[in-house]
Amino acid sequence: MSDPAKVRRHAERVRELVASVVRSQIKDPRLGMITITDARITADLRDATVFYTVLGDASAQASTAAALESAKGMVRSTVGKALGLRHSPTLTFVLDDVQDQVKHIDDLLAQARHADAEVQRLATRAEYAGEAQPYRLEEEPEGSGDEVPPPGGDQR
């Protein structure tokens, strides 16, 4: 199967099904506040990667990962039946670090804004390092440099 549109539709359907199963069928107390953010499936529809985020600290993320691993078989069975494919895709759950990347980029942008403000503040008090006009504007004396020498060199 190499139809990208069909693969995309199946990936979206896997995301919806996994979110539904996690919300309604998994009763594991280790499962935290989870959001299924994305799903990707291979072109042969055999392997699916499901991305999720968890609200909480590292321990909540670890316990949610353990809960998803223990419920992986039941989730795969439900997804396989709902998709109606010959083979149920193998599910791999991956913690989505988009929120961490967004925070890191926001921090970098804040640092850049702070540095720009500092440069702007220093520029308002800036003075010339030398004179205001560094190039000398002297009038040239008469007969210097404007005359063209006669052809053949200097004739005396």
Curated annotation (Swiss-Prot):
NCBIfam families in the record: rbfA
Protein name: Ribosome-binding factor A
Membrane-spanning parts: none
Domain of life according to the entry: Bacteria
Family annotation (InterPro entries): KH_dom-like_a/b, RbfA, RbfA_dom_sf, Ribosome-bd_factorA_CS
Database matches in SUPFAM superfamilies: Ribosome-binding factor A, RbfA
Subunit record text: Monomer. Binds 30S ribosomal subunits, but not 50S ribosomal subunits or 70S ribosomes.
PANTHER family (UniProt xref): RIBOSOME-BINDING FACTOR A, CHLOROPLASTIC-RELATED
Family: Belongs to the RbfA family.
UniProt region (Disordered), positions on chain: 124-156
Function in brief: One of several proteins that assist in the late maturation steps of the functional core of the 30S ribosomal subunit. Associates with free 30S ribosomal subunits (but not with 30S subunits that are part of 70S ribosomes or polysomes). Required for efficient processing of 16S rRNA. May interact with the 5'-terminal helix region of 16S rRNA.
One annotated GO biological process: maturation of SSU-rRNA
Species name: Salinispora tropica (strain ATCC BAA-916 / DSM 44818 / JCM 13857 / NBRC 105044 / CNB-440)
Subcellular compartments: Cytoplasm
Cellular component terms (Gene Ontology): cytosol
Keywords noted in UniProt: Cytoplasm, Ribosome biogenesis
GO molecular function annotations of the record: ribosomal small subunit binding
